[in-house]
């Protein structure tokens, strides 16, 4: 079935439990003052079509993870620090397609506090704004931002970041690429705020960056 929602005051769709999307569903969030979909537990996308436009995060899991095995999700956000997918735990993508376009400063296509695993599907992320100075730090836009480790064993990833100091993939842990296709383009200029500075980077890992296979193309 189909559902069209507008969040005039807060989140458009919210749940204290998990949210699951199956084949045949068609969910449209026309707009939301905060998050498009906000859940305290996990989000499971097994099929269907999600078209979400929000000021805040398009999909946020406050205390859970995100799993995607199929379907299509088109995610658009406008606020600063608003993300396409935001998970406080792991994100696992094995199928389906995600198209994330985030317009605010310091926004991310995917923001993952845990580990990110991609074994299939297609991810496209576009960021266009500059870095944001906050709490004595510069926070940049990124197609993917992961606090844990990233493992890519398949799928197609295409990221374009045009804003100042934008990152394609930004990982606090280690990145391992065994297969799949990863294409990253970053064109932003360097951002300087006092003694702080940040430059555009295609792929950045604070831990090890290991490429065992697949195709990796970076223009930065």
Positions of predicted regions on the chain:
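A composition-driven surface/loop motif
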Residues: 1-220
């Amino acid at each position: 079935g189909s559902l069209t929602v507008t969040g005039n005051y807060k989140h458009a769709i919210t749940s204290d439990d998990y949210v699951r999307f199956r084949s045949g569903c068609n969910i449209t969030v026309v707009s939301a003052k905060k998050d498009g979909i906000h859940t305290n537990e996990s989000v499971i996308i097994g099929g269907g079509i999600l078209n979400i436009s929000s000021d805040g995060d398009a999909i946020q899991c406050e205390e859970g993870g995100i799993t995607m095995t199929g379907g299509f999700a088109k995610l658009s956000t406008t606020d600063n620090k608003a993300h396409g997918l935001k998970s406080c735990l792991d994100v696992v993508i094995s199928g389906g397609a995600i198209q994330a376009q985030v317009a605010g400063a310091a926004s991310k296509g995917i923001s993952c506090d845990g580990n990110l695993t991609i074994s299939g599907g297609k991810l496209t992320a576009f960021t266009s704004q500059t870095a944001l100075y906050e709490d004595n730090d510069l926070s940049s836009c990124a197609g993917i931002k992961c606090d844990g480790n990233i493992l890519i064993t398949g799928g197609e990833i295409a990221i374009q970041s045009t804003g100042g100091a934008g990152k394609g993939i930004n990982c606090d842990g280690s990145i391992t690429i065994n297969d799949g296709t990863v294409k990253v383009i970053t064109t932003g200029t360097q951002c300087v705020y006092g003694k702080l500075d940040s430059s555009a980077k295609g792929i950045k890992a604070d831990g090890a960056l290991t490429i065992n296979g697949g195709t990796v193309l970076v223009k930065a």
